[in-house]
């Protein structure tokens, strides 16, 4: 039997996942990070994108987070996310529409334009779309 670590994924809405996993793969500030049992303790920020859990038995479950933090302790991994959605609940058409709306907002700069906010919305929408496309490509969903 493979070694496991307890993982919690929590957002402002509440606990989204709690259980034993063999691996957690997340999109950190410096790139993807994989956490397996016995990983050194750390805290890092997470960019918008997928969180992939490899559960006991090798089954994968994917979530989309809009950003947050990852904490690793000797027997526990905790993801504190701004918002979380199960990847299966994401809609590609909605994600594509959000990307187009964010790109349009960037192109039509008005007097009260906030570039930082507009680019953040575009990055989040693009990450959501990438998550949907990755899942469809890997799992045929």
UniProtKB/Swiss-Prot annotation:
Cystine connections: none
Compartments reported by the entry: Cell inner membrane
Membrane disposition: Peripheral membrane protein
A GO term, aspect molecular function: ATP binding
Annotated Pfam families: ATP-synt_DE (PF00401), ATP-synt_DE_N (PF02823)
Record key words, sorted: ATP synthesis, Cell inner membrane, Cell membrane, CF(1), Hydrogen ion transport, Ion transport, Membrane, Transport
GO cellular component: plasma membrane; proton-transporting ATP synthase complex
Family matches, as InterPro entries: ATP_F1_dsu/esu_C_sf, ATP_synth_F1_dsu/esu, ATP_synth_F1_dsu/esu_N, ATP_synth_F1_esu_C, ATPsynth_dsu/esu_N
Source superkingdom: Bacteria
Function according to Swiss-Prot or TrEMBL: Produces ATP from ADP in the presence of a proton gradient across the membrane.
PANTHER family from the UniProt entry: ATP SYNTHASE DELTA/EPSILON CHAIN, ATP SYNTHASE EPSILON CHAIN, CHLOROPLASTIC
Subunit structure: F-type ATPases have 2 components, CF(1) - the catalytic core - and CF(0) - the membrane proton channel. CF(1) has five subunits: alpha(3), beta(3), gamma(1), delta(1), epsilon(1). CF(0) has three main subunits: a, b and c.
Family: Belongs to the ATPase epsilon chain family.
Name the record gives this protein: ATP synthase epsilon chain
Source organism per UniProt: Pseudomonas syringae pv. syringae (strain B728a)
Designated gene of the protein: atpC
